[in-house]
Curated annotation (Swiss-Prot):
UniProt GO cellular component terms: cytosol
Function of the protein: Part of a heterotetrameric complex that catalyzes the two-step biosynthesis of anthranilate, an intermediate in the biosynthesis of L-tryptophan. In the first step, the glutamine-binding beta subunit (TrpG) of anthranilate synthase (AS) provides the glutamine amidotransferase activity which generates ammonia as a substrate that, along with chorismate, is used in the second step, catalyzed by the large alpha subunit of AS (TrpE) to produce anthranilate. In the absence of TrpG, TrpE can synthesize anthranilate directly from chorismate and high concentrations of ammonia.
All residue ranges annotated as the Glutamine amidotransferase type-1 domain in the record: 3-196
Gene coding for it: trpG
GO function terms (MF aspect): anthranilate phosphoribosyltransferase activity; anthranilate synthase activity
This protein's name: Anthranilate synthase component 2
Catalytic residues identified in the record: C84, H170, E172
Length: 196
């Protein structure tokens, strides 16, 4: 079981995600992004098997309160999973660039090809995913591996060593097939090296 520290970026999807993780048997503690990174870091350090979940939210990563600072403090120390805005914040934290996607995507189902990474274990490729975003990673640093794309747009990344992964799409949406399996796989992968 993971102790999920959930960074809430004031998004309407938050409770769908929290419910999914709890139904998978994980403990979830929610911190809104106006809480100082230092406070959240102290809470993380007291937990066994912590995984930081960086939630979706409005705007750009730089506007997401304490989240960017928290990623800088915790990367390489604690596994992290970012969704939508959280994914974009991970890309920026590792030196990448996030910019306009060319169109605003709101509730669109896309067929995504993935690289059969452990996170996508036993999931079909292409996989139907739900997208809600206007920003996208336009430059991904060498330290991150792109694990899935749609129309040459980056849909997921991982940092194998740091146990950090990001999803541009919404696994918790009903429109993403196998979303619960994907989130379960991501947590399992995140905790693997943690115990090694």
């Amino acid at each position: 079981m993971a102790n999920i520290v959930f960074i809430d970026n004031f998004d309407s999807f938050t409770y769908n995600l929290v419910d999914q993780f709890r139904s998978l048997g994980h403990s979830v503690k929610i911190y809104r992004n106006h809480i100082p990174a230092e406070t959240i870091e102290q809470a993380i350090n007291e937990l066994e098997n912590p995984v930081v979940l960086l939630s979706p939210g409005p705007g750009a990563p730089s506007e997401a309160g304490s989240m960017p600072e928290l990623i800088q403090r915790m990367k390489g120390k604690v596994p992290m999973i970012g969704i939508c805005l959280g994914h974009q914040a991970i890309v920026e934290a590792y030196g990448g660039t996030v910019a306009g996607a060319g169109e605003i995507i709101h509730g669109k189902v896309s067929m995504m090809e993935h690289q059969d990474h452990a996170i996508y274990q036993n999931l079909p490729s292409p996989l139907a995913i739900a997208r809600y975003h206007s920003l996208v990673a336009t430059k991904v640093p060498d330290s991150l591996t792109i694990t899935a794309e749609v129309d040459n747009l980056v849909m997921s990344v991982v940092h194998e060593q740091d146990k950090v992964c990001g999803f541009q799409f919404h696994p918790e949406s009903i429109m993403t097939t196998y979303g619960a399996t994907l989130l379960g796989n991501a947590i399992e992968w995140a905790l693997e090296k943690n115990n090694a």
